[in-house]
């Protein structure tokens, strides 16, 4: 599996690269903002782009939109500390493959493996909020969830 890590915290990038490389994952590049994410994605075409949301220059949401408009098959996994409803909704609307919280570092490797295998991955805390967000927002799109994911979300 070939990935790119994008995070404005250089220590996070470096640590993740070391940890994931030791697990056999090829980290082909790292970057610190959305502009670098776009450039590095075009250059390396990774299996997965692991990216933070709030960053300088271009944030992760805007970078993802640009990448997905040019490469609709791109597999983007957000790794963030932010649980904001706005970000969760935008992630689902644009079709990113996952949204996991940095506080749960143990789930990063399994999340990468699941996304690599074609699954969507959201932390339990995020999944449990989706039905409430859906009810609050009349136009909340769930088109990017398959029937099984929607079934699990509604439970």
At which residue positions do the language-model features occur?
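Active-site beta3 strand of CheY-like receiver
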Residues: 44-50
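Receiver (REC) domain active-site loop signature in two-component systems and cognate sites
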Residues: 55
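Short, flexible helix-to-coil linker/hinge segments that flank and couple to helix-turn-helix
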Residues: 86-92, 103-143, 147-151
